[in-house]
């Protein structure tokens, strides 16, 4: 009887965790057998934005497809870096050719606002957010199709 109850609790926890991961909309890399982070998709999907922990597209990363919102980047779970939230951690990004991203300095879409949009024919690569003043300062974001950037 006790085992049945424990199994039920574990199953419930697993379903809740799975639902939470799906609701964030984040797709992160999984480590390979050697514990290394796999390469970033190349080419990146036309309708996606990839965010990197370090400049020059290095370190851990996660990918959002268009029409995803995250009002608090502390809520993203990336399997290879589970103990680190992404609030104030993004240092470079790549925007798929049919995508755009709008981001804010504070959670809940408050504070200073910035954005990047690809031109429809090629990926927009931003190797460093240091110069634009956004390095490790993004706390919430929205991704959209390039044609809907103004609606962010």
Describe every region a protein language model picked out.
Residues 12-24:
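Bacterial N-terminal signal peptides
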């Amino acid at each position: 009887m006790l085992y049945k109850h424990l199994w039920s609790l574990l199953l419930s926890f697993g379903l809740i965790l799975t639902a939470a991961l799906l609701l964030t909309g984040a797709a992160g890399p999984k480590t390979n057998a050697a514990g290394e982070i796999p390469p970033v998709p190349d080419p990146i999907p036309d309708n996606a934005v990839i965010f990197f922990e370090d400049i020059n597209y290095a370190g851990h990363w996660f990918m959002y497809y268009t029409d995803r919102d995250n009002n608090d980047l502390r809520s993203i779970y990336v399997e290879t870096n589970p103990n680190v939230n992404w609030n104030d951690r993004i240092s470079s990004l790549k925007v798929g050719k049919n995508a755009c991203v709008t981001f804010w300095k504070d959670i809940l879409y408050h504070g200073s606002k910035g954005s990047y949009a690809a031109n429809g024919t090629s990926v927009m690569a931003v190797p460093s957010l240091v110069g634009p003043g956004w390095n490790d300062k993004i706390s919430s974001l929205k991704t959209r199709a390039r044609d809907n950037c103004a609606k962010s």
